[in-house]
């Protein structure tokens, strides 16, 4: 407020001086301010146009370059995203195929194991029957041998009891004669 009071005498002196001379301060506020503002504005535009213009042009070019670079990055990111989505879809297809193949393989293995188990059971049954038949034959043979042995023993005992030395000599001579004819 104090500076406004000090300026007032200066304005009065300038206005008195302007009435005496052709160049001076115009006390009409509307007329003087519009011209002064226009002069100041044109002066600023003229002075700052070149430096601000080149700075603004550089800034505009940088902004446009940044926008273009961002758009390129967005386009690259979009293409990478679409490529990744394609790869994901292909991977899902491959995973599904692998799962199907694994299920088929598991089913084949299970069927093969069951079939092999059935074959093994049949083979064991046949082997068991064969072993039983072999054991029966062996037991029959042993029984037959035992019967033959007992029969021979009984016949031998009977012959020893019933056979005299004359009969034994006749049998020996008869067998020797048969052997002599064959030679």
UniProtKB/Swiss-Prot annotation:
It is a single-pass membrane protein. One of its GO terms (molecular function) is proton-transporting ATP synthase activity, rotational mechanism. Keywords: ATP synthesis, ATP-binding, CF(0), Chloroplast, Hydrogen ion transport, Ion transport, Membrane, Nucleotide-binding, Plastid, Thylakoid, Transmembrane, Transmembrane helix, Transport. Its main location: plastid. GO terms for cellular component: chloroplast thylakoid membrane; proton-transporting ATP synthase complex. The keyword Signal does not apply. InterPro entries: ATP_synth_b/b'su_bac/chlpt (IPR002146). F-type ATPases have 2 components, F(1) - the catalytic core - and F(0) - the membrane proton channel. F(1) has five subunits: alpha(3), beta(3), gamma(1), delta(1), epsilon(1). F(0) has four main subunits: a(1), b(1), b'(1) and c(10-14). The alpha and beta chains form an alternating ring which encloses part of the gamma chain. F(1) is attached to F(0) by a central stalk formed by the gamma and epsilon chains, while a peripheral stalk is formed by the delta, b and b' chains. F(1)F(0) ATP synthase produces ATP from ADP in the presence of a proton or sodium gradient. F-type ATPases consist of two structural domains, F(1) containing the extramembraneous catalytic core and F(0) containing the membrane proton channel, linked together by a central stalk and a peripheral stalk. During catalysis, ATP synthesis in the catalytic domain of F(1) is coupled via a rotary mechanism of the central stalk subunits to proton translocation. Component of the F(0) channel, it forms part of the peripheral stalk, linking F(1) to F(0). Belongs to the ATPase B chain family. This is ATP synthase subunit b, chloroplastic. It comes from Porphyra purpurea (Red seaweed).
């Amino acid at each position: 407020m104090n500076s406004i009071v000090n300026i007032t005498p200066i304005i009065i002196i300038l206005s008195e001086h302007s009435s005496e001379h052709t160049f001076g301060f115009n006390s009409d506020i509307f007329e003087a301010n519009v011209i002064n503002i226009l002069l100041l504005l044109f002066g600023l535009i003229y002075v700052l146009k070149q430096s601000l213009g080149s700075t603004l042009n550089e800034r505009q070019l940088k902004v446009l370059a940044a926008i273009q670079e961002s758009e390129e990055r967005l386009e690259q990111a979009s293409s990478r995203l679409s490529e990744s989505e394609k790869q994901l879809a292909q991977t899902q297809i491959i995973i599904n195929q692998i799962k199907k193949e694994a299920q088929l393989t598991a089913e084949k293995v299970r069927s093969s194991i069951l079939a092999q188990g059935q074959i093994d059971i049949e083979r064991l049954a046949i082997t068991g029957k064969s072993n039983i038949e072999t054991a029966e034959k062996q037991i029959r043979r042993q029984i037959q041998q035992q019967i033959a042995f007992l029969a021979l023993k009984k016949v031998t005992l009977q012959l020893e009891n019933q056979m005299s030395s004359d009969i034994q000599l006749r049998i020996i001579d008869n067998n020797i004669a048969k052997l002599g004819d064959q030679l």
